[in-house]
Amino acid sequence: RYGTLALDTGESLDSAEATLATATIAYSLRDDVEAIQWMHGHVQETGELPLLEAETVVRSLAIAMHSQSEIILPLLQLKEFDQYTTTHSTNVSVLAMAIGEYLGFAGRELRVLGVSGLLHDLGKVKIPREILVKPGGFTDEEFAIMKAHPKEGAKLILDRDVRLEVPAVVAYEHHIMLNGGGYPAFHFARDTHYASRLVHVCDVYDALCTNRPYRAAWTSAKALDYLEEKTGTDFDPVFSLPFIKMMKERSVQRLSLEDPEVKPSSPSPPGGEGDRG
């Protein structure tokens, strides 16, 4: 169903020890994915967020990142379009913790970034599936429904625990650009939370690198070029420039959750610019 991306320092992961380690990560990720799928289903059915499961997944992802001598970023590869919210949420959580650690965050701050990344799209459980997987453009009515997911996500998170203020704010703000564009629109100009600006970078990068019903995946290089081009308007340079540097410092390897053999990645076909949600 899925694949992963492991980012290392350029050395080949061809030893038996490395293969065993990456296979262990793959099996762990399968458990994490199943937990997230269950969590989304539980929220959809009951309206209640199982916080313990969310925190457990974030801790598991953090452990997977540090399971070898170099930091590994286990990013899931989408196979079926209706799995997008699950795989994307996992990837954004990993990327948010990775750039946070790269910038010197630690401990609770990193866990908050991980939980914020994991829950940033939680409001999509309220969006009809036919809209989420629709090929082609949205109608005005469909886009209005899609644009409600930040508010829905923030409400679901705050209803669970008011102490989840940062993840709730990130869920609300993650589609707002540095220049104030995006959605939901503010009634007056103000800065977004720093965690929202950090997650926004991770969110757009992973969305661009993922096949969607309405466009093919971009290569990592093309997505990073887009982040650089939009830095200062869409993206905060405090986070986008270190993110670009971090991703360029590491080479990409692919491995399948069904088959732990490490395989070189192949370029993805480019698509149109930007992402709709």
Language-model-detected regions and their locations in the chain:
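Glycine-biased, low-complexity coil/linker segments
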Residues: 272-274
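All-alpha helical catalytic cores of prenyl diphosphate-utilizing isoprenoid enzymes
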Residues: 61-66, 83-91, 122
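Short alpha-helical scaffolding segments that buttress acidic/His motifs in well-ordered protein cores
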Residues: 36, 58-62, 72-76, 96, ...
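Divalent metal-dependent catalytic cores for phosphoryl transfer on phosphate-bearing substrates
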Residues: 74-80, 88, 104-170
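Non-catalytic interface/linker regions that flank or bridge core catalytic/transmembrane domains
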Residues: 1-79, 265
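Alpha-helical phosphate/pyrophosphate-handling elements in metalloenzyme active cores
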Residues: 82-113, 186-191
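An active-site-proximal "capping" alpha-helix that borders the catalytic cofactor pocket
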Residues: 91-99, 145-158, 219-232
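Histidine/acidic-rich helix-loop-helix segments that form or flank divalent-metal centers
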Residues: 117, 157-160, 165-200, 214-264
